[in-house]
């Protein structure tokens, strides 16, 4: 009696599944998903709260340090915006190893490009200008003169806020003026707005309420 062989069901071809698995693994292991993007410098963010019962240095507190793009944004998104700080408070972002004070070895012969804002600009411009300042610093936006940059400070004050970029050598005209021009352009300030650069020594010894400008752009 003849026997009929049962039909054999074709075995599914495994390679596509393997390919899918491989693709899936590649997607999970994509370096862009877990490798952080290093910055050229390590930076330290400081906070100052004006408590008159304490010394100036006791009021200055180191918040955190970072050296990657991702860690910068994690920190920035975690802290209060400058516009929400109480009057008398400061944020300072400086290269690691430089303290946000005139007396620091890297600052004592330097100065600052100063942006002054009126009270109405706290809501419209302060946070935008400060973020752009931070991005200028960590992005090394000043070409060959980025090494001259020490850090930046935002002062929140009742009469009007200030933002400044500090450089290490006030006599270095080429570096100072280049930094000032780039900074003014990055902030989107119109040509009619003039910003000034003041040495820390002049600021410390000023006799009136204003300090003379060494340079303007």
UniProtKB/Swiss-Prot annotation:
It is found in: Cytoplasm, P-body; Cytoplasm; Cytoplasm, Stress granule; Nucleus. The modification Phosphoserine is found at residue 209. GO terms for cellular component: cytoplasm; cytoplasmic stress granule; cytosol; eukaryotic translation initiation factor 4F complex; nuclear body; nuclear speck; nucleus; P-body. It comes from the Eukaryota. Phosphorylation increases the ability of the protein to bind to mRNA caps and to form the eIF4F complex. Phosphorylation also enhances its mRNA transport function. Phosphorylation at Ser-209 is not essential for protein synthesis. Pfam families: IF4E. The modification Phosphothreonine is found at residue 22. GO terms for molecular function: DNA-binding transcription factor binding; enzyme binding; eukaryotic initiation factor 4G binding; mRNA cap binding; RNA 7-methylguanosine cap binding; translation initiation factor activity. Keywords: Acetylation, Cytoplasm, Initiation factor, mRNA transport, Nucleus, Phosphoprotein, Protein biosynthesis, RNA-binding, Translation regulation, Transport. InterPro entries: TIF_eIF4e-like, TIF_eIF_4E, TIF_eIF_4E_CS. The keyword Chloroplast does not apply. eIF4F is a multi-subunit complex, the composition of which varies with external and internal environmental conditions. It is composed of at least EIF4A, EIF4E and EIF4G1/EIF4G3. EIF4E is also known to interact with other partners. Interacts with EIF4ENIF1/4E-T; promotes recruitment to P-bodies and import into the nucleus. Belongs to the eukaryotic initiation factor 4E family. This is Eukaryotic translation initiation factor 4E.
